[in-house]
């Protein structure tokens, strides 16, 4: 198996945190955004960058703007942002 090629400019996301806050499983989120649960897992691990359409669908589920869910720079822990 060849080594996985990581994107030059990774897209960081808060999908796992947002999903967990809502007690939502990967399967539930996958059904809402019309993808396989494996795709949700790959997004959460940073193994897959979403298309613009998929990013918008994810943000719609969480009721948040794109910049609150996805970023080119790593997110600070949410607790630091809230306090």
Predicted feature descriptions by range:
Residues 1-21:
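A short, Lys/Arg-rich alpha-helix, primarily the initiator
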Residues 16, 27, 56:
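Residues within the helices of the helix-turn-helix
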Residues 26, 37, 47-48, 66:
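The DNA-contacting recognition helix of HTH DNA-binding domains
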Residues 53-68:
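DNA major-groove recognition helix of helix-turn-helix/homeodomain DNA-binding modules
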């Amino acid at each position: 198996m060849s080594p996985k090629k990581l994107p030059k400019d990774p897209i960081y996301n808060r999908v796992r945190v947002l999903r967990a806050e809502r007690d939502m499983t990967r399967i539930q989120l996958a059904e809402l955004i019309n993808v396989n649960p494996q795709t949700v897992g790959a997004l959460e691990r940073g193994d897959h960058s979403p298309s613009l359409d998929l990013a918008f669908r994810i943000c719609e589920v969480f009721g948040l703007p794109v910049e609150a869910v996805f970023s080119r720079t790593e997110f600070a822990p949410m607790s630091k942002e809230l306090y």
